């Protein structure tokens, strides 16, 4: 039987004991390393992807937003802290900075301008520039000595930084209407003159037709002459259908205008079969349903304009 020297036995015991110590050290290091992770590179990732990547690494995302130099960065990570490659324990916080896009403009000042002029100009500019910076929120009206429709204040305020489509709301003047409106006597008047008077006085009206004599004249009105009315009141007038030959068409142009906070210029124009243009009606309106009688040649075209912008065409057959 082989008997090892004592020195050899001691050496073997030391090797075995040392191996056990190293094994335990490696075991505990592995256990400890399971609680740490390396911060990933999040640059250029979309916000959703960056958050998921941090959650996968058992790190807590903290999101902050700021402007960047490029509009293409919007919604993506443009900076992070700590930097990629940093070793952290699970549950630590990583700040990711998300781009709000580039500052592409500052809010203009519209204070002191008429609301309808501003809206028309903004829409025209958006078509020319192929981009829309503002979404106009319904304006708020307040009592003021300023003329009706004048912008008193705006939100966002002039000079505010914007990077994308921005809600823009105005506070506008209601103005003061010092003239009371009274209904006139329209019965017995030819319909064209009655309509012109109603439009000139900015009185809302509806039209009914009757197949009786007195061709083309107003035969009744729903509100008696001399009655004081409000802006919201509407009068119904009944027209005796005019007598026309087979080349002429009598009808009612009906169209629902978009509501405006103040009066806008409306015109109804006729494009005749001979190519000549003429004006049928010109008036101011805040919008809503309009009914306008016409008497034109077959084949003519009636055009409806807000200011000088064509909004409707009707071919008469």
Swiss-Prot record:
The organism's place on the tree of life at top rank: Bacteria
GO cellular component: membrane
Membrane topology of the entry: Single-pass membrane protein
Compartment list: Membrane
Keyword Transmembrane assigned: yes
Organism: Borreliella burgdorferi (strain ATCC 35210 / DSM 4680 / CIP 102532 / B31) (Borrelia burgdorferi)
Protein name: Uncharacterized protein BB_0063
Subcellular location, principal: membrane
Transmembrane segments: 11-31
Matching PROSITE patterns: PASTA
Record has Transmembrane as a keyword: yes
Domain PASTA stretches: 33-100, 101-174, 180-241
InterPro entries, per database record: PASTA_dom
Keyword line: Membrane, Repeat, Transmembrane, Transmembrane helix
């Amino acid at each position: 039987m082989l008997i090892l020297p004592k020195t050899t036995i001691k050496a073997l015991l030391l090797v075995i004991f040392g191996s056990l110590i190293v094994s335990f050290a490696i075991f505990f290091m592995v256990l400890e390393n399971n609680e740490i992770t390396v911060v990933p590179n999040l640059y250029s990732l979309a916000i959703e992807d960056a958050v998921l990547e941090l959650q996968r690494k058992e790190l807590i995302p903290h999101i902050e937003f700021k402007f960047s130099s490029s509009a293409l960065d919007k919604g993506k990570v443009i900076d992070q802290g700590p930097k990629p490659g940093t070793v952290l324990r699970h549950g630590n916080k990583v700040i990711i900075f998300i781009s709000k896009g580039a500052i592409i403009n500052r809010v203009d000042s519209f204070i002191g301008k008429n609301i309808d002029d501003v809206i028309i100009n903004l829409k025209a500019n958006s078509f020319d520039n192929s981009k829309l910076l503002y979404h106009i929120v319904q304006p708020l009206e307040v009592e003021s000595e300023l003329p009706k429709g004048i912008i008193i204040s705006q939100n966002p305020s002039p000079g505010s930084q914007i990077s994308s489509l921005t809600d823009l709301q105005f506070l506008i003047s209601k103005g003061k209407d010092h003239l009371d409106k009274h209904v006139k006597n329209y019965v017995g008047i030819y319909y064209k003159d009655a309509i012109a008077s109603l439009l000139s006085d900015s009185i809302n009206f509806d039209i009914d037709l009757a197949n009786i004599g007195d061709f083309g004249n107003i035969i009744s009105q729903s509100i008696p002459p001399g009655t004081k009315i409000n802006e919201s009141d509407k009068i119904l007038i009944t027209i005796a259908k005019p007598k026309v030959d087979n080349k002429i068409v009598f009808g009612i142009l009906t169209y629902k205008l978009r509501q405006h906070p103040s009066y806008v210029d409306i015109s109804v124009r006729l494009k005749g079969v001979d190519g000549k243009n003429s004006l049928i009606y010109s008036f101011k309106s805040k919008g809503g349903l309009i009914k306008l009688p016409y008497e034109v040649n077959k084949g003519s075209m009636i055009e409806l304009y807000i200011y000088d912008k064509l909004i409707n065409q009707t071919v008469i057959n």
